[in-house]
């Protein structure tokens, strides 16, 4: 059992840390609500665009394009989304675990893997593990923007169209609710419209200027929006995870303060009791 002074110092230290975690939770809360609103708006637009393309597909329009070409897979590119800062629980660890398993699976199948990390934490893990990776997009998730999403999407589309990758995959966290961020692994290219929102009803379309022109414009736009939505979704999930981590830290601090306060009171009571016994013992001797 520590001295009264030691216990008081520990309580003061924990309360100081608690103020920091509370401030970080408030900052993450503001960023979370902003990212969530942006995600919802962008996702609505992306889903509507997907529905239009599915409607064209159901009307038997010719939507074949370089982005839908199915090939034998010998080279895979993986864009993996994480955070650039810590203190967000198991957020980055879960992504790294899934990525490590995926890389090993492809190694066993003798499939070449190209890595495109978004987030300093996942880039650090890849570096420590000795993997080579593209460093051009590591920081674009810190302040998600449509322009940065387009730059990444263009790189991934170029890899696929030029045959440098036979499949492009995305690995990220999808925000489900405050307590749950789901690790999601999906194929980005070749584009499969059957994986997107289906149109409610089949409709006869009159296409102007042409199906080819629509393909050339809508497919890249959908692929750009997909990356942008994932950047925002990852940001939303990250801030939600950090809020939960800071809340857990705050709760643990409260529990520890209660335990130390109880220990302080017991120690103080014991010290007072000992002093009284010494006084009573001295009085008995003098009498």
From Swiss-Prot:
It is found in: Cell inner membrane. GO terms for cellular component: plasma membrane; proton-transporting ATP synthase complex. InterPro entries: ATP_synth_F1_ATPase_gsu, ATP_synth_F1_gsu. Keywords: ATP synthesis, Cell inner membrane, Cell membrane, CF(1), Hydrogen ion transport, Ion transport, Membrane, Transport. GO terms for molecular function: ATP binding; proton-transporting ATP synthase activity, rotational mechanism. It is a peripheral membrane protein. F-type ATPases have 2 components, CF(1) - the catalytic core - and CF(0) - the membrane proton channel. CF(1) has five subunits: alpha(3), beta(3), gamma(1), delta(1), epsilon(1). CF(0) has three main subunits: a, b and c. Produces ATP from ADP in the presence of a proton gradient across the membrane. The gamma chain is believed to be important in regulating ATPase activity and the flow of protons through the CF(0) complex. This is ATP synthase gamma chain. The gene is atpG.
């Amino acid at each position: 059992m520590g001295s009264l002074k030691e216990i008081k110092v520990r309580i003061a230290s924990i309360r100081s840390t608690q103020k920091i975690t509370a401030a970080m939770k408030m900052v993450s809360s503001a960023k979370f609500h902003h990212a969530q609103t942006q995600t919802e708006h962008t996702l609505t637009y992306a889903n509507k665009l997907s529905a239009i393309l599915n409607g064209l597909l159901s009307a038997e329009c010719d939507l074949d394009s370089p982005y839908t070409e199915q090939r034998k897979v010998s080279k895979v590119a993986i864009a993996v989304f994480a955070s650039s800062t810590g203190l967000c629980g198991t957020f980055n660890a879960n992504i790294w675990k899934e990525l490590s398993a995926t890389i090993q699976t492809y190694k066993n199948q003798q499939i070449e893997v190209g890595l495109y990390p978004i987030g300093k934490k996942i880039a650090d893990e890849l570096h420590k593990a000795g993997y080579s990776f593209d460093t051009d997009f590591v920081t674009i998730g810190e302040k998600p923007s449509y322009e940065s999403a387009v730059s990444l999407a263009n790189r991934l589309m170029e890899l696929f169209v030029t045959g440098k990758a036979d499949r492009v995959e995305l690995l990220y966290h999808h925000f489900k609710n405050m307590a749950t961020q789901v690790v999601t692994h999906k194929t980005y290219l070749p584009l499969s419209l059957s994986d997107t929102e289906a149109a409610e009803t089949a409709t006869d379309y009159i296409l102007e200027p042409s199906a080819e022109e629509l393909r050339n414009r809508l497919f890249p736009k959908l692929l750009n929006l997909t990356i942008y939505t994932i950047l925002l979704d990852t940001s939303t999930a990250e801030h939600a995870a950090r809020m939960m981590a800071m809340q857990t830290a705050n709760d643990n601090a409260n529990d520890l303060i209660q335990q130390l306060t109880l220990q302080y009171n017991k120690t103080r009571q014991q010290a007072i009791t000992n002093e009284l016994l010494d006084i009573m013992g001295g009085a008995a001797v003098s009498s």
